[in-house]
Amino acid sequence: MDHLAHHYHAHIAELNRRVAEIVSREALSGLVIHSGQPHRMFLDDINYPFKANPHFKAWLPVLDNPNCWLVVNGRDKPQLIFYRPVDFWHKVSDVPEMFWTEHFEIKLLTKADKVAELLPSDITNWAYLGEHLDVAEVLGFTSRNPDSVMSYLHFHRTTKTEYELECMRRANQIAVQGHLAAKNAFYNGASEFEIQQQYLSAVGQGENEVPYGNIIALNQNAAILHYTALEHQNPARRLSFLIDAGASYFGYASDITRTYAFEKNRFDELITAMNKAQLELIDMMRPGVRYPDLHLATHGKVAQMLLDFELATGDAQGLVDQGITSAFFPHGLGHMLGLQVHDVGGFSFDERGTHIPAPEAHPFLRCTRILAPNQVLTMEPGLYIIDTLLNELKQDSRGQQINWRTVDELRPFGGIRIEDNVIVHQDRNENMTRELGLA
C-alpha cells in the first residue's frame, strides 16, 4: 500500500491542477461533487445497488457510501463531507482511516438533508457535478454539470496518473485469478451458474462489486454479445466457453475476455488464429496511432480468417468493403478503460469536447481517439456466428460468398472474443492482462 500511497500524492496534485485550470477558465469558485443517492425500487423499500459517481471516486476510493460530497477548487485542501448517519437498521460506514485521508479535510454529515450546513455558504458560483440535478437545484446551484467542465474533465481522464495505472494493474491481477478459476471450472464440467460462483469466489468480489455483469457463456450462448443470463443446467454437449469478466480495485475496472474450446478441433484452431491476430494488433498500438485505424486493421484480419477457415470466398478487402466482416465481427475493437468500463473521453478531440464520430460503416466503435501515453484501452477482436446478422447477407448477393456449411458447423460454438487491457507508454505497450499471468 505504501507504493500506492506514494503515487496517490501525485494523483491528488494532478486532480487539483485540473480543477484549478478549469474553474479559472470558467470563472467558477470551484466544484462540488456528489457521490450520489440511493435509488429505491418501485413500490418497494429496497434500494438498487449503489454506484458512486465516477467523478467522485476519481478522488478517493469511497465506493459504497451515498450522500457524500467533495468540495474542491484546486487551491485549498479538498473537503470531504462524509455521510455517517445514526442508523440501527443498516451498517454505517466507519470514518475513513487510510493513506488518502491526510489529503482531505473531513466533515461528518449525520442527516443527508442537512448538507447545506456543510457546503460553502454561497454556492451560486460553484458548479455541481452529479446525477441528482433536482437536489442541486434545491440547494441553489445554478451551474449543474456544465458542458465545458465535463468535457474538460472527460478529455483529461483518458490520461491516467501513476496511481490510476497501479490500481488498474491490481484490478487485472485480481481478475486474472478469477479467469483461471473459471477456466478450470469449465473443463471440470461446471454449469454457467457454477462457473460464475467460482469466478466471484476467486476474485473475492460479489456480483455488485465487480465492474459489470459477467458474461459466462457456454456453446451457442457465446454468440450473444452481452449475454448475462446464467443457465443452471449444463448443455447436452460441452463445446465452448466464452468468459468476459473483470474486477474492481479502488474504483478502477479491469475488463478481460477469453474463449476456450472443450476439445481440440477446428474451433480451437480458430481461437488460436484470433489470439495471434489480437497480439499483432496490440503490437501496432503506439502514441500517434488512430484507434479507428486499428479497428479497420482488425477487419482485415477477420477477413483473412474467414478465407483461411473457409467461412467465405473472395478477397479480404472485398469482404471488408461489402460489410461481410461486420456480420461476423459487429462490435468495436475496444474502448477506453478506467473508473468506468466504457470510460469517458473516447470520442473527444480536445478538452472542449469536440466530437470525433465513429466511421459511418462502423457505428459501434467506442473509441476514435489518437493514442497517447498513459491511456488504457481494451483490445477485443472477435468472430461470431450470429444468425440475425448473417441472415441479412442471405438477402442479397453477398450470401453467395458465404460457405453456409461451415457456418452451420461452427454455429453451436457461438463465437470467439479475446480481450486484454493495455497501457500505452511512450516507448512500449504494457499488456497488463498477459503480463499478470493470463495466456
Swiss-Prot record:
Sites where the protein binds Mn(2+) 2: 244, 255, 419
Record's cofactor remark: Binds 2 manganese ions per subunit.
Single annotated GO MF: metal ion binding
Enzyme Commission number(s) from the entry: 3.4.13.9
**Domain of life the protein comes from:** Bacteria
Listed A to Z, the keywords are: Dipeptidase, Hydrolase, Manganese, Metal-binding, Metalloprotease, Protease
Report one GO cellular component: cytosol
Q: Does the keyword Metal-binding apply?
A: yes
Instruction: Kindly list the positions annotated as binding Mn(2+) 1.
Output: 255, 335, 380, 419
Catalyzes what? Xaa-L-Pro dipeptide + H2O = an L-alpha-amino acid + L-proline
Q: Does the keyword Nucleotidyltransferase apply?
A: no
Query: Signal sequence: where?
Result: none
> Which cofactor does the UniProt annotation name?
Mn(2+)
Biological processes, Gene Ontology terms = proteolysis
Its annotated function is as follows: Splits dipeptides with a prolyl residue in the C-terminal position.
In Swiss-Prot or TrEMBL terms, this protein is called Xaa-Pro dipeptidase
